[in-house]
Amino acid sequence: MAAALRSAGVLLRDRLLYGGSRACQPRRCQSGAATAAAATETAQRARSPKPQAQPGNRKPRTGILMLNMGGPETVEEVQDFLQRLFLDQDLMTLPVQDKLGPFIAKRRTPKIQEQYRRIGGGSPIKMWTSKQGEGMVKLLDELSPHTAPHKYYIGFRYVHPLTEEAIEEMERDGLERAVAFTQYPQYSCSTTGSSLNAIYRYYNEVGRKPTMKWSTIDRWPTHPLLIQCFADHILKELDHFPPEKRREVVILFSAHSLPMSVVNRGDPYPQEVGATVQRVMDKLGYSNPYRLVWQSKVGPMPWLGPQTDEAIKGLCKRGRKNILLVPIAFTSDHIETLYELDIEYSQVLASECGLENIRRAESLNGNPLFSKALADLVHSHLQSKERCSTQLTLSCPLCVNPTCRETKSFFTSQQL
């Protein structure tokens, strides 16, 4: 057990944070008062009310389950969030996980709580997901009256409302159609795959078939409106750099990294993130030098690289001191944008390296065009009569998780 604890402590140190605003100001330009005000605003936004019922209390016909990992809204929720995360075998496998997971969660809680305090006391991801869902279903009712009324549901893996709780609410509402809509544009077995597995497990464990017809939007890395949103936010942020420096700004597209052991099993995530980056740069006319980098590496084992912080250091050493960070795999702000990118990299690391200007492109958050993208994705999906993407039907060539096969069978067997 001691050896297992030491091993897990190394593998899971410091940055395994999953949770979802503003762009960072140039280095050393934001005052302490401004930082405190921003943190207070983030805390207020994080403690948002639950999603409202369908307007007019009309019985919903089509439900859209918005899938994500979620994030603690208060520091008091951090330990439960971490415990669920460390117990998720779709995300990671540990020795004696039922004992080791809670142990690590308890040990990590104080440090992670302090990081959430630094961003205002909680994650705003639920608030942003609610706003995005509201905008999406409003547009859907206009775009697709024959599948209306539409209602969105939030299904988080590690905080309330949990995926299982959302499914129970959907069953009570008596829906005809249910769309499992991942909020990760790029598919990974550890994110979207874990959420889809949770849907299969729910029905398998309760021992009954769904009363509604399920399908899933399991990836959307190159949707035109998603690409337009990213391009718009990049252009907006580039305008804040000094005019004489603008063309030499290095754009660093930062995505959550993955262990190479997962990648080598055939997880499609790296290719799909790369596809998003290429489409965005094509939209921008390749106006600036750019790289795809990876953040949040944990432990000594090989992960996708280069790491975001190492890339920043390397560029600075080579005289490239104007950098724009773009969170390309996150659509809403959370701990990895607000703390890791905005504080660890844009404040602490930037000061250590001597960067001239570093900014972070705003997350998609409440952008109306992003709500339009979500509505268009669901509308097109409902019209297509597809159960899932063709890619979802293909298991990773070296898959080691038998639940994945059962989940794929669950969705492909639905009679729409």
UniProtKB/Swiss-Prot annotation:
Q: Name one GO molecular function term.
A: ferrochelatase activity
Q: Which SUPFAM superfamilies match?
A: Chelatase (SSF53800)
Q: Where is the transit peptide?
A: 1-47
Q: How is the cofactor bound?
A: Binds 1 [2Fe-2S] cluster.
Q: Which reaction does it catalyse?
A: heme b + 2 H(+) = protoporphyrin IX + Fe(2+)
User: Where, per UniProt, does this protein localize?
Assistant: Mitochondrion inner membrane
Q: Which domain of life is it from?
A: Eukaryota
Specify which residues bind protoporphyrin IX according to the UniProt entry for this protein: 108, 116, 123
Question: Which cofactors go with this protein?
Answer: [2Fe-2S] cluster
Where is the catalytic site?
223, 376
- Positions carrying N6-succinyllysine: 131, 283, 408
- Positions of region (Disordered): 41-62
Q: Which EC numbers does the record give? A: 4.98.1.1
Any Pfam family matching the protein: Ferrochelatase
Where N6-acetyllysine occurs along the chain? 50, 283, 408
| GO BP | heme biosynthetic process
Positions annotated to bind [2Fe-2S] cluster = 189, 396, 399, 404
Pathway listed for it?
Answer: Porphyrin-containing compound metabolism; protoheme biosynthesis; protoheme from protoporphyrin-IX: step 1/1
Question: Any idea which UniProt keywords this protein has?
Answer: 2Fe-2S, Acetylation, Heme biosynthesis, Iron, Iron-sulfur, Lyase, Membrane, Metal-binding, Mitochondrion, Mitochondrion inner membrane, Porphyrin biosynthesis, Transit peptide
Q: Name one GO cellular component term.
A: mitochondrion
Q: Which family does the similarity line name? A: Belongs to the ferrochelatase family.
Matches recorded under NCBIfam families: hemH (TIGR00109)
Subunit composition and interactions: Homodimer. Homotetramer. Interaction with PGRMC1; the interaction results in decreased FECH activity. Interacts with ABCB10 and SLC25A37; this interaction forms an oligomeric complex. Forms a complex with ABCB7 and ABCB10, where a dimeric FECH bridges ABCB7 and ABCB10 homodimers; this complex may be required for cellular iron homeostasis, mitochondrial function and heme biosynthesis. Interacts with ABCB7 and ABCB10.
Q: What does this gene product do?
A: Catalyzes the ferrous insertion into protoporphyrin IX and participates in the terminal step in the heme biosynthetic pathway.
Q: What is this protein called?
A: Ferrochelatase, mitochondrial
- Species for this entry: Bos taurus
